[in-house]
Amino acid sequence: MSMTPREIVHELNRHIIGQDDAKRAVAIALRNRWRRMQLPAELRQEVTPKNILMIGPTGVGKTEIARRLAKLANAPFLKVEATKFTEVGYVGRDVESIIRDLADAALKMLREQEVHKMRHRAEDAAEERILDALLPPARPVGFSEEPVQSGDSNTRQLFRKRLREGQLDDKEIDIEVAESPAGVEIMAPPGMEEMTNQLQNLFANMGKGKKKSRKLKIKEAFKLIRDEEAARLVNEEDLKARALEAVEQNGIVFIDEIDKVAKRGNTSGADVSREGVQRDLLPLIEGSTVNTKLGMVKTDHILFIASGAFHLSKPSDLVPELQGRLPIRVELKALSPQDFERILTEPHAALTEQYRELLKTEGLHIEFLEDGIKRIAEIAWQVNEKTENIGARRLHTLLERLLEEVSFSAADLAGKQQGEPIRIDAAYVNEHLGELAQDEDLSRYIL
């Protein structure tokens, strides 16, 4: 990650409106991973990441920050919900499976990168195999031991040219490809995922190396052979060693819904399991060793980012040890009408642009006017205030309701449209949403 914190925030601004404190915190944390790797080896071991706790109502951008961060980081990244895990001894997944999943994500990411690097070599090899199938080598005549070239050189070059131009894409050929391992579905009780994976790998390896002849169109055959050749060029042992290093040094885990495992002050009973999940998370966040398919993974330098709405509990309801292991606290603010306006227009691939382009595929043109966008933002904010505050997700509900008739009749309307777009202004919004927004009972159930 060679991007500076300012560049990371700038990139996040393309997709997420507001929440500058949270963006700055994750940008600094991400940059610190790079800074740490520049230190001498001895000092590097002593520098541990400062984990982050993001607090804020639902729908304000906590999860979206995590999603965008994953794309920016180019590092092993895993997003999990805290509610999926149970205390050791209860039925369900244990928290160590987080690190096992992170190891799988790292291996997959590095394999994709390696295959991408080998793409050109794999394409050349695939091209040669297809040309061999199109122009089989001639058999030697009599007792001659001289090697026979695969097809006449000029003919081969002619076929190569036609293959690259796509003229042979629909021609069928018989080709030998690696046989897909039989998919073995193993049902196992929760918490036994590791054993299930090992058994599935065992069955997959049993059929490895077998080939079978298939009749395929050249376009499909080329993709299959290219992937097969690329996989053959990748050094699996080297890949596993690099993936292990990447997980330990650059891994990032985003734990969502952390507030759902917080012990609430006035309840008891099932909360024992919640507190147990927190206690199981402690050694993972503090630093422990977990057995994965890559080997033993040390979690000392994995960055943990936890987030939660905390509308039924408080951060202080988390066990004190866990609070101490999440030293950086960032509060995300509830959205204002102005924020809703910006969400509708400013981000890359904003909601209004998505609907405009979707309907354009039917030949129907719609235009969102400024007063229309302002009115949608006002209604979204009002409904959130009157009923449950679900943040920016309210806009999805409103826009679906607003454009329901247009979406349903898009093909018919496109035929009648005389070059004039359908204009979504304040009057149009009031006509379709005004009554629902005013009636609290209706908005509670429909919006």
Curated annotation (Swiss-Prot):
A Pfam family the protein falls into: AAA_2
This protein's UniProt keywords: ATP-binding, Chaperone, Cytoplasm, Nucleotide-binding, Stress response
Positions of ATP binding: I17, G59, V60, G61, K62, T63, E64, D256, E321, R393
Membrane-spanning residues: none
Cysteine disulfide links: none
GO BP term (any one): proteolysis involved in protein catabolic process
Subcellular location: Cytoplasm
GO MF annotation, one: ATP hydrolysis activity
Domain of life: Bacteria
Primary localization class, coarse: cytoplasm
GO cellular component terms, A-Z: HslUV protease complex
UniProt subunit comment: A double ring-shaped homohexamer of HslV is capped on each side by a ring-shaped HslU homohexamer. The assembly of the HslU/HslV complex is dependent on binding of ATP.
Known function: ATPase subunit of a proteasome-like degradation complex; this subunit has chaperone activity. The binding of ATP and its subsequent hydrolysis by HslU are essential for unfolding of protein substrates subsequently hydrolyzed by HslV. HslU recognizes the N-terminal part of its protein substrates and unfolds these before they are guided to HslV for hydrolysis.
Family: Belongs to the ClpX chaperone family. HslU subfamily.
UniProt-listed NCBIfam families: hslU, PRK05201.1
Name of the molecule in the record: ATP-dependent protease ATPase subunit HslU
Organism: Stutzerimonas stutzeri (strain A1501) (Pseudomonas stutzeri)
